[in-house]
Amino acid sequence: MSTSQKKTARGLFTLGIATVIALTPSFTSSAAEASSRPWMNTSLSPEQRAAKLVSAMDLSQKIHMLSGTKLTGPHTPATGYIPPIPELGIPEFVQSDGPAGVRNGKNHATKFPAPLTYASSWDPAIAGLEGRVAGEEARALGTDQLYGPGFNIARNPLGGRGFEYYGEDPYLSGTMATANVKGMQSAGVIATLKHYVTNNQETSRHISNSEVPERALPVSYTHLRAHE
């Protein structure tokens, strides 16, 4: 790995940790603890706290934060679970699927209509309200991160997960997703946009080849800019 790649990887890792710190209430401490663990000092910005924490972590702890477990542990059937690191004051981190509400079979949560119906209203406030309620339920159930919203473009009506998205219009998709993310994160839960660009089929999606014309890619996926 080149020096620039290492710097980029470290920057992305630090940014991810900063996001977790900013949205996870568990990252608070007393004055005494903040002295021995400077990343627990809430007077610092999330970025500053993340940088101090990353500097204190060894390689195994960094790998731990990037891997975790899937569908195992005390929070089964959560989508993902990262056990705590007590020596650093890092709490457990629970992830659940969430494009249409919290998917967690252990506890009850509201099953919202398919996001495609929100897009049919042309009203971002509806997507924002769903995001806020889903975020509040996730927080109440002990979930820190939701895998949602989904805002890939529904280019193929036969796509098995098209119902999770906001339809085929790029700008509308970006607008609805923006409102949903803001609503979700207002509850203190991390939103996760999905799925990756040109992921338009579920079967063999990790090994299939998506051939997109050079013109279609920037035109059809301008919703990414709309979200930014």
Predicted regions and their residues:
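Bacterial N-terminal signal peptides
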Residues: 14-24
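A short, basic/aromatic helix-end/turn motif that makes direct DNA contacts
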Residues: 228
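Intrinsic disorder/low-complexity segments
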Residues: 1, 23-27
